[in-house]
Amino acid sequence: MKKIIKWNKTVSTVILIGIIIIAMMCSNICVRDNYYIKEVFNEEGISSKVNIIPKPMSYQSKEGKFILTKGSAIYIKGNTDEETEQIRWIAEFIRQKLSLSTGFPLDIIDSDKPVNGSIYLTTINSNKELGNEGYEMNTTSKGVKITAYKPEGISRGVQTLRQMLPPEIDSNTVVDNIEWTVAASVIKDKP
């Protein structure tokens, strides 16, 4: 019986990773009229457009921006050890993706007490009404927090995070002279 339970957890984790990889690959596909462009103004008054595909349920811009640096880390915490492990797989995937273009190590830390300048992925104190794939992403100058009811929602949230960064984030080699910023905002979405 224990082998079956362990096998089921392993299979669940492998399936989740597969879904994450497919979703991340598909996130670059533009669906007509199903995207969101928000004009955001930086501190100098220069506008930039934020493209989010698919269009989120709500987007509220705030003042400021988060800057991803070589000292940034990814903090993870689930409601259970199993959720934390699933979130770790998502964090590993996004770390690999972001590190290619930024060159930043982005350590993954198992803690519900993220420090300033970090990304925090969690299911703690989440909103059940968002469903299994919904998420809330709150970005301030101090950090990015993606909260979801289930790890599947965190997977969708990190796709949005990736889209909020400069387009050079998709480079397979380190890009120099880029400030890796995310506009301060609150985004809520569910399929």
Indicate where each model-derived feature is located:
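N-terminal Sec-pathway targeting helices
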Residues: 2-16
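Acidic, contiguous N-terminal accessory segments
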Residues: 22, 28-190
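Hydrophobic membrane-insertion alpha-helices, especially the h-region
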Residues: 15-25
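Position-driven detector of the extreme protein N-terminus
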Residues: 2, 25-26
